[in-house]
C-alpha cells in the first residue's frame, strides 16, 4: 500500500501508468486509485486520475492514521513532502506552524517552526537515507546557528534546535 504513494503525481495518471510506476498489478491499482477518489484524494475524469499539490501528503497522513509505519511512508516522500509531513505532525499536536521561515543578515532558512506554550521548535528536515558523522555534525552546527539568529531576532523568544531525519 505504501508503494502507491510513488504513483501519486500532479496531473493525470492512468491505471496502467500507476501500475507501472508502483509495480502493483492493474486490478489492484485501479482499486487503490478508486479508493483514493472515494476518500477525497484526487478526481477521476475520462479514465485519468488527477491529483493536486498536497494530495500525496494527505494520503501519507491517512496512512499514518491507519497505523502504517512512519519510516516506510517517509521514504516514499520527497523533501518537500517530508517537510510538509513534519509540519502536519506538529499541527496535529496543537503547534502553530510556520514553514520555510527566512531570516536575513545573514540569510538563513528554517524548514519548519512549531510554536506552543511560548517555546519555538526550529526544525531542519533532512531527507537523508544515509549520512556520515561529518554531515550530521555540520547540520547540527548550522541548526544551532539558525537557532541563535532566530532568538536574537525574536525578542523574548525561547527556541530549541531540532533535526529530523529518516534514519
Question: Which stretches of residues belong to each language-model region?
Answer:
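Cell-envelope/extracellular polymer assembly enzymes that use nucleotide-activated donors
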Residues: 111
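Catalytic cores of nucleic-acid endonucleases
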Residues: 125-167
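Interdomain/boundary linker segments immediately adjacent to catalytic/signaling cores
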Residues: 3-81
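Active-site beta-strand-loop-beta-strand hairpin of nuclease catalytic cores
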Residues: 114-124
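Short beta-strands and strand-loop turn motifs
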Residues: 68, 124-125
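Surface-exposed alpha-helical segments enriched in charged/polar residues
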Residues: 3-6, 34, 88, 141, ...
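A short acidic/basic microdomain associated with nuclease active sites
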Residues: 87-106
Amino acid at each position: 500500500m505504501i508503494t502507491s504513494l510513488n504513483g501519486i503525481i500532479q496531473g493525470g495518471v492512468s491505471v496502467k501508468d500507476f501500475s507501472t510506476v508502483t509495480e502493483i498489478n492493474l486490478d489492484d491499482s485501479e482499486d487503490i486509485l478508486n479508493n483514493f477518489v472515494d476518500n477525497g484524494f484526487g478526481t477521476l475524469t475520462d479514465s485519468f486520475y488527477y491529483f493536486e499539490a498536497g494530495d500525496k501528503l494527505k494520503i501519507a497522513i491517512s496512512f499514518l492514521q491507519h497505523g502504517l509505519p512512519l519510516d516506510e511512508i517517509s521514504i516514499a516522500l520527497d523533501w518537500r513532502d517530508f517537510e510538509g509531513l513534519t509540519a502536519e505532525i506538529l499541527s496535529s499536536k496543537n503547534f502553530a506552524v510556520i514553514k520555510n521561515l527566512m531570516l536575513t543578515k545573514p540569510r538563513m532558512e528554517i524548514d519548519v517552526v512549531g510554536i506552543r506554550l511560548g517555546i519555538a521548535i526550529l526544525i531542519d528536515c533532512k531527507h537523508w537515507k544515509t549520512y556520515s558523522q561529518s554531515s550530521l555534525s555540520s547540520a547540527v552546527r548550522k541548526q544551532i546557528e539558525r537557532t541563535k539568529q532566530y532568538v536574537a531576532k525574536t525578542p523574548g523568544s525561547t527556541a530549541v534546535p531540532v533535526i529530523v531525519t529518516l534514519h
